[in-house]
Amino acid sequence: VPKNNQGVPKALREAAVLDAASKLFTTQGYRETSIAAVGKAVGVAPAAVLWYYPTKDDLFAASLHKIFIESRRHIESNRKIAGDPHAELAELLEQMLPFRGMHREAYERMADSEALREVYGEVQRWLEERLLKVIDAHAPSDVDRTLVTDVAHIFFEGMLISVRAIDRPLTEYIDMVVDAAIGVASARKARRK
């Protein structure tokens, strides 16, 4: 395990801290993971952990970002689904299921943590890019895309933090939400005429 010394490149020490923190946050959650526990797992003092990540929220955000980036790379390099926005959405949600506890805790902390807001902003932009492509493929051209996107975002956010068991393929949930949101947006538009 890289020690916090000048003989080990900073990037390796920082990566070791992040790997240890990610494992602890995943298994123990935010509340039960301390900076001291992360330092102990890596073999450095808590102050050394804080040198790389100034706050526990920064470390937590970096852990969530690492999970998202690894999932995104997997998705974008998978020839079977890369370029298919529907399949990419389903796969990202599938890969995030084991981390729902972390997502719940992140949502609780977001109001107080710029770092967490930034990470979730990136995740939401990625989801929205794919979601808009799915909507564009299925919705009439005059549907209120903003309303449809907002409804779908609420669903995706709920799925990321839900404690309910997922008992069917995620593609079914995506189809249901997109179809329902498009239907509601179309019906609202028709009522206003």
Describe these PLM feature segments:
Residues 1-12, 23, 189-193:
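N-terminal intrinsically disordered/low-complexity leader segments
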Residues 12, 16, 20-58, 62:
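Helix-turn-helix
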Residues 62, 73-98, 149:
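Hydrophobic alpha-helical connector segments
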Residues 65-71:
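Short, basic, alpha-helical segments at the C-terminal edge of helix-turn-helix-like DNA-binding modules
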Residues 72, 95, 114-140, 146-150, ...:
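Amphipathic alpha-helical packing segments from all-alpha helical-bundle domains
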Residues 95-121, 161-164:
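Amphipathic alpha-helical segments used for helix-helix packing
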Residues 156:
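Cytochrome P450 catalytic-core helices
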